[in-house]
Amino acid sequence: MTNKMIQGNSLHANNQSAKAKLMGAVRESIPKAFATTKWLLSIMIPVSFAVLLLNYTGVLAVISGYLAPVFELMGLPGESAFVLLTSIFTNIYTAIAVITSLELEGRVVTILAAMCLVSHGFIVETAVLKKTGSSAIRMLLVRLLGSFAIGVFLNWALPTDLIHAQTQVLVQNESFKVMFMDWAWSSILLSVKVVVLITLLMILQRILEVFGVIKLMSKILAPLQVVMGLPESTSFSWIVANTLGLAYGSAIMIEQVEKGQMAKSDADLLNHHVAVSHSQLEDPLLFAAIGAPLGWLIIPRFLLGVLVVWLCRLERGLKKGLNFNSKKSGD
């Protein structure tokens, strides 16, 4: 009887301890989630409004017209430039809306989808990558060159026995008032989504950290991290970026850097990977819904991310060698 009472008291104490840890995780996470949400929305809302103005005034269409010859070199219709440009300044959803307004065959849709998955939301996502330790200009170049590398590869690898359909961009005929109201409503929905997702994600991250799950996940993923050229400390942020994307995953990435759980040099390596390979669940599925095969949207981006990291490591090694030689010659 005494042993049962002792065991019962011990179990009760453990439950109380677990509850205290959970409540503590929630209390610690909410202020940080609010700060990250405020920072993210302060970028997203003004940028989306600026893009609304560029689209309404026809500036995006004019710029895409100048870029059309570059896309034709990859076997894509000239109007494809408008799709990628829209993706760069906005998001995947808008890019899909533009694609579905064009008469494109499956091969072209697949190439464009893969390029958009690498190059979208440049302003917001580059701000995230910069805040976690990378050069903004470098990240822009990595993503832009990466999207064209993917486009060239898929143009070479995909079957070429399909004929390009004639395409034509549908001109925006909506009044500014209608466009503004649509933008305002979508911005409200986006804000709610950002607040909810980031708050829940920050709470989850803190709970996993308190109960030691993150360390366990890091050990399990260690072999894959070695292949990818990424440090073990980046494993959880890598999972978050590949499931939720950079915008929603930014809270975790920033938190880990600020708390010293991930060195900025390690975060920079991670950023080189996730710059071209992130959000490997929802975004590819959205394009799959309009006919693009998932394999061609996921695997090439992952392999490109691995290649970019190893190239970055090679660059760092060469710089260290040059610095060592210069110091030696100076002595």
Question: Where would I find each of the regions flagged by the language model?
Answer:
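Alpha-helical membrane segments and immediately flanking helix-loop junctions
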Residues: 77-134, 228-287
